[in-house]
Amino acid sequence: MFITEIQLKNYRNYEHLELSFEDKVNVIIGENAQGKTNLMEAIYVLAMAKSHRTSNDRELIRWDEDYGNIKGRLQRRNSSISLELNISKKGKKAKLNQLEQQKLSQYIGEMNVVMFAPEDLNLVKGSPQVRRRFLDMELGQIAPVYLYELSQYQKVLTQRNHLLKKMQGNSKNEETMLDVFTLQLIEHGAKILRKRFEFLHLLQEWAAPIHRGISRGLEELEIVYKPSVDVSESMDLSKIKEVYYESFQSVKQREIFRGTTLLGPHRDDLQFFVNSKNVQVFGSQGQQRTTALSLKLAEIELIYSEVKEYPILLLDDVLSELDDYRQSHLLNTIQGKVQTFVTTTSVEGIEHETLKEAKTIHVTNGTVDCEIDRK
């Protein structure tokens, strides 16, 4: 799949922009704070209906405007699809082929993207929240039902936490309601957990050989899910629910005392091991970066295996963060099969066949100038 064009209106620092793209490589060049990352982000938001940079949608709307709008056209193997996302203070509305979608989960997944930005290098050494977000965003693309369960879980979690804070003063009168929320949380949480186990099993199958290749056969990568309750990948849904119920019963008084939910997918984490050593704790910076690169390349192949088309790859100022060897491995892997967008302040020092035929887009203060063929 590839995106052929995009239109922006009141998006970040773009008042109005219409731009067409090559189906292979597009290089976006500009100094910092000129709008190249905003353009890359707009492609991501068009696909995912949320930003990888902020959770505050208001930041996506141009200063002093009431709304922002992104339109694009996606070419898939057997069809051409128009996508539109309107962002306002009231929320987001999405359209596919001019038809408004009732739920964003019906929209997300039509256009698949893999973003690789400098902050993704923190996937290994960053906070658990970074890794959970990685899971949610990537899994949501290939399993819309996961996004539904996640949104329902978040709603119940918010209600349950509000009730727990209220119960800190007087718990007895609200215990029945707490039990209702607990059962709802278990219902959605168990399904989220089951989907995460399945996804990580597939990701492991792709990431391990990729990591082995990048490390020239010297390193074996293992991805380990660390749930907040004592469950395992081998358990079925009913067993996971049973363990959740018993675990919530055991921490009930502690949750009331602390006024917050202590268990569930929102408390889980991922760990990465290279040659049986925890990369977050014992890995070198090079090993941490190789792990992040392996995961991103594995995402590309996993999405292809699920939807039978390669996703769009967004490389946002990340090539300069990789050494020549990892840079070459990345570009060799995607060459000729993945539509790729690259942002950079300069193409000097990046000598690779993949970039030779690229469309070059120069960005200066929210305006663009294009040229094709850097040769």
Curated annotation (Swiss-Prot):
Q: Where in the cell is it found?
A: Cytoplasm
Where does it sit, as one GO cellular component term? Answer: cytoplasm
Which segments does the entry list as coiled coil? none
Q: Name one GO biological process term.
A: DNA replication
- Which HAMAP family does the UniProt record give? RecF (MF_00365)
Residues the entry annotates as binding ATP? G30, E31, N32, A33, Q34, G35, K36, T37
Signal peptide (UniProt feature, chain positions)? none
Sample GO molecular function, one term: ATP binding
Show the CDD domains listed in the entry: ABC_RecF
Q: Which family does it belong to?
A: Belongs to the RecF family.
Which InterPro entries does this UniProt record tie to the protein?
DNA-binding_RecF (IPR001238), DNA-binding_RecF_CS (IPR018078), P-loop_NTPase (IPR027417), RecF/RecN/SMC_N (IPR003395), RecF_2 (IPR042174)
User: What is this protein called in UniProt?
Assistant: DNA replication and repair protein RecF
Q: Which SUPFAM superfamilies match?
A: P-loop containing nucleoside triphosphate hydrolases
NCBIfam families, per the entry: recf (TIGR00611)
Gene3D superfamilies xrefs: P-loop containing nucleotide triphosphate hydrolases, RecF/RecN/SMC, N-terminal domain
UniProt-listed Pfam families: SMC_N (PF02463)
Its biological purpose: The RecF protein is involved in DNA metabolism; it is required for DNA replication and normal SOS inducibility. RecF binds preferentially to single-stranded, linear DNA. It also seems to bind ATP.
| Keywords assigned | ATP-binding, Cytoplasm, DNA damage, DNA repair, DNA replication, DNA-binding, Nucleotide-binding, SOS response
Q: Which gene encodes it?
A: recF
